[in-house]
Design a protein with these regions (language model features):
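Internal alpha/beta loop-helix hairpins
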Residues: 1-57
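Non-catalytic connector elements of ABC transporters
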Residues: 34, 43-160
């Protein structure tokens, strides 16, 4: 797969690699299936950094192959929609999950093997969780419900 913008190659590689590891916001949004969050780096901790979005709780993001990130930098991160878990406030987070962004359910679409849950996590932008069908219907959410959007820390990827 080759993703181009205005006649220039942004990223090329096997489809699975480009989809799962987009290099930048353009590729992530073009390929779809990603939530992109923007913020400022609040702290760098060896193998990870903390991304701050306004008054929200900081998000821990592994540095992975990305180097040269410093405190105060503005950066985008991507989290695949199928890596986002939704839990009710007060419930325990799934193992390995640390970030928990309060959100309100704005729409629900049944897609067959998963349920697409749209959230107001990011003002004026789309944030979506693909919840497995059986998981969703075991304890379904309704439009207007408050939930916590969470994911395992190493599933967040810094973008260029």
């Amino acid at each position: 797969v080759v993703v181009m913008e205005q006649g220039r190659i942004k990223q090329a590689g096997p489809a699975r690699e480009v989809y799962a590891h987009p290099r930048d916001r353009y590729v992530a949004e073009f390929m779809g299936g990603q939530n992109v969050l923007s913020g400022r780096v609040a702290k760098v901790n060896g193998g990870s950094f903390l991304l701050k979005q306004g008054a929200r709780e900081a998000i821990e993001v592994p540095l992975q192959a990305r180097r040269g990130i410093g405190v105060g930098d503005t950066i985008d991160i991507a989290v695949r929609r199928d890596d986002v878990a939704l839990v009710r406030p007060g419930a325990s987070l799934p193992p390995g999950c640390g970030t928990a962004l309060p959100s309100r359910v704005t729409a629900i679409e049944y897609q067959g093997y998963f349920v697409k849950v749209m959230l107001d996590t990011v003002p004026d932008d789309e944030f979506v969780a693909y919840v497995p069908e059986k998981t969703f219907f075991a304890d379904p959410f309704n439009v207007g419900d408050v939930v916590l959007a969470t994911w395992v820390a190493d599933r967040a990827r810094p973008l260029a």
